[in-house]
C-alpha cells in the first residue's frame, strides 16, 4: 500500500506541477506542501479532498488504499 504523501507527489509529477503551484492552489506555503509530500506533517483531510477533486481521483486512490484510479465521485 502506498502512503498518501507518496501518492500526492506522484500525482503532482505526473501532472507536471511544481510544489509552488499546488501550494498556491491550496492556499498554503510551499514549505508546508513540501512537508506534506515528505510525510513530515499530516495533510488535513480537507486538502486531500481538494487534491482528489483536482486530479479527478477518488479518496481511496489518493490515500493509497487502492491502486485503481477511479474518478472523484460527482454529487
Predicted regions and their residues:
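Short basic helix-loop element that most often maps to the first helix and adjoining turn
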Residues: 6-25, 50
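A detector for short, charged/polar N-terminal pre-domain segments
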Residues: 1-6, 70-74
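DNA major-groove recognition helix of helix-turn-helix/homeodomain DNA-binding modules
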Residues: 27, 46-61
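Short, charged recognition helix plus adjacent turn
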Residues: 53, 63-75
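Recognition helix of helix-turn-helix/homeodomain-like DNA-binding domains
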Residues: 27-42
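Conserved hydrophobic/aromatic packing and binding residues within compact polymer-binding modules
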Residues: 8, 22-23, 33-36, 62
Amino acid at each position: 500500500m502506498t502512503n498518501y504523501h507518496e501518492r500526492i507527489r506522484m500525482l503532482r509529477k505526473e501532472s507536471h506541477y511544481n510544489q509552488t503551484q499546488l501550494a498556491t492552489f491550496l492556499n498554503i506555503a510551499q514549505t508546508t506542501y513540501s512537508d506534506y509530500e515528505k510525510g513530515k506533517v499530516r495533510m488535513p483531510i480537507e486538502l486531500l479532498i481538494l487534491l482528489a477533486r483536482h486530479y479527478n481521483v477518488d479518496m481511496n486512490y489518493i490515500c493509497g488504499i487502492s491502486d485503481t484510479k477511479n474518478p472523484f465521485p460527482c454529487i
